[in-house]
Amino acid sequence: MSALPLSRRAAIAAALVMPAAAAAATEASAQSGSDAASVDLVRRWADEVVRPLKVQFGDLAHPDLVMELHGAGANADGTPRVLTGLPAVVAWFDQVKAQHAAPVSVRIDQMVAQGDTVAVRAENNWTLRGEGDSQQRRAQTIAAFYKVQDGKIAHIWRFTDRVPRTQT
């Protein structure tokens, strides 16, 4: 699997260039039939896996799925955390699910597809589990790129704000 030919700075810049004001909620742009199929697959991933934090998703993900976590979720030294293979990604979802008091709310602001790659700009909202009544609502902006292979998600590059915003 080849790496996405963008530096971290270029990927973040690309995410910032997609203007929020011009994008209606869940706006999707696809140039061909295969683009539309890729967008539909990524939308299903958000609806059926990310929002409910479902950990069984082999029907949507390639067995050799690679997920790169940049920003929040990255290694302590700031380098991307790379999860290789379905078991590693499932284990990560299990870990995330254990930290949240309620399902994650994901608002997709924009999806753009070209060929087998889909770019997504979104916001995650969730409640972290705390001790006692110390649960706090949080929000994070994310940009992600999804590579589709054989009708399944094969590679995810996820760029997430390292410092979430606290909601009241």
Protein language model features and the residues they cover:
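Short, low-complexity N-terminal intrinsically disordered segments enriched in polar/charged residues
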Residues: 2-5, 15-55, 59-63
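A short acidic/glycine-rich loop-to-helix N-cap element
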Residues: 31-33, 131-137, 164-168
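Hydrophobic pocket/interface hotspot
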Residues: 42, 56-57, 65, 85, ...
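A solvent-exposed, acidic/Ser-Thr-rich amphipathic alpha-helical stretch
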Residues: 59, 63-114
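Short, cysteine-centered beta-strand-loop-beta hairpins and adjacent loop/turn segments enriched
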Residues: 99-102, 126-137
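Short, surface-exposed coil-to-beta transition loops
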Residues: 104-107, 123, 137-143
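A short hydrophobic beta-strand element
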Residues: 116-124
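Short beta-strand edge/turn micro-motifs at domain boundaries
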Residues: 139-167
